[in-house]
Amino acid sequence: MWIKNGYRLAKKKKNNNYLFSKERNEKFDVIKNEFYKNKLLTDYLNIKGYKSFQSGKWWLGSWEEGKFDGGMTHGDFARQGRHGDEGLKIGREGLNPIFDFIDQTQEDGDPFFVWYAPFLPHTPHDPPQELLDKYIKLAPSEPVAKYWAMCEWFDKTVGDLMNYLKEKSLDENTLIIY
């Protein structure tokens, strides 16, 4: 392994599947096991009756391991799970899993916690065309324009979530940490 400019560069394997290999999974388990020796935010929230939902980036295995009540990330390297796998669709493909979770907690009368950590603005940089058009003439290059558009897309999804909370009259009694 080499460190260059703050990035870890793993030696390439012949089949280039190291990221999803059993070997990497076993090494990563050591890190996860150390992390999970500690109490988690979800532990404290569960004690107070909160229901919690994970979406987006989650580098520590599955949502179940994080003691969430629901979620999107399976975290299984053998199934190409990495950094959030299914959870990475959140934001890019809408917010319906989060909205459904919030609706269910309200139906059940439970307080809720949502982990919303979309992979926006990470690659692939494929913003909606209207956002790209906004930045293409302002940016020094197309890749920079795409990145800026992705950042705005991320902000837009946060706004969509906040608007949803307002529509449900939950905005006055909800803490948002951004």
Roles of regions detected by a PLM:
Residues 1-178:
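Formylglycine-dependent sulfatase
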